[in-house]
Amino acid sequence: MERGSKVKILRKESYWYQEIGTVAAMDKSGIKYPVLVRFEKVNYNNVNTNSFADNELIDLGK
């Protein structure tokens, strides 16, 4: 998984559950949710990004 990769969301409580987004950034410092994912549609707060852990994503490649 790298910047620009397409990923599918597995976190059930997420607004974007089962949606496909693009990896915008990855943090290597050891934080809990290091992968920032950008989506086409916005959520109810008018936000189109969210952070996820590696095990909450399926890498679909570029």
From Swiss-Prot:
UniProt-listed Pfam families: PSI_PsaE (PF02427)
Question: Which is a Gene Ontology cellular component entry for this protein?
Answer: chloroplast thylakoid membrane
Query: What kind of membrane protein is this, topologically?
Result: Peripheral membrane protein
What SUPFAM superfamilies does the entry give?
A: Electron transport accessory proteins
Q: List localization entries.
A: Plastid, Chloroplast thylakoid membrane
Which keywords, in A-to-Z order, does the entry hold? Chloroplast, Membrane, Photosynthesis, Photosystem I, Plastid, Thylakoid
User: Could you tell me which PANTHER family the record lists for this protein?
Assistant: PHOTOSYSTEM I REACTION CENTER SUBUNIT IV A, CHLOROPLASTIC-RELATED, PHOTOSYSTEM I SUBUNIT IV
What HAMAP family does the record point to?
Answer: PSI_PsaE
Family recorded in the similarity comment: Belongs to the PsaE family.
The protein's job, in short, is: Stabilizes the interaction between PsaC and the PSI core, assists the docking of the ferredoxin to PSI and interacts with ferredoxin-NADP oxidoreductase.
Q: What is this protein called?
A: Photosystem I reaction center subunit IV
Organism of origin is: Porphyra purpurea (Red seaweed)
